[in-house]
Amino acid sequence: AREPFDPSKIHNFFNQEWPGVIRSKGFFWISSRPEFIGEVSQAGAFVRHQGIGRWWTTVPKDRWPEGPDFDALMDKYWNKDFGDRRQEIVFIGLKSEMNEKNIRERLDACLIKNYLEDPNSYHKAVDPFPVWFQKVA
C-alpha cells in the first residue's frame, strides 16, 4: 500500500496479538511523520518499532546518491503521489494458524485512504509512538 497508516490505528495493531505469526519485519509510514521511515520487527510476543531514517522523497534531490543502482531502486519504488513512501511488512507464520486474509484486512483498516484530499490535516493526527529522532540544536 502507498497510503499512510493512521498512527493510533497502526499502533493499536502492533500491540494486538497476531495468532500464528512467528516473525514479522518491514517498513511503514504514518501520517503524522511523513518524512520518516518506521521499522517494525516482531519475534514471538516481542514487537519493536522505531524510526530508521527519511524517505528519499523528503531529501533534496541534490543530496541523492548517483548511479544506476540508486536509479533502479527509485524506478522500482517511486510513485507520483507518494514518492518512495510505502507500507512493506512481511509476516511469517504457521500456515495452520496464521490468517493472512485477516492480517491484510486489519492492516488495510489502518490506512488513510483519503490522505491525498488534505494531507496537512492528517499530519496533526494523534500519535502514540515514542519520539524517533531528537533535533540537534
Language model features by range: what are they?
Residues 1-137:
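P-loop NTP-binding site
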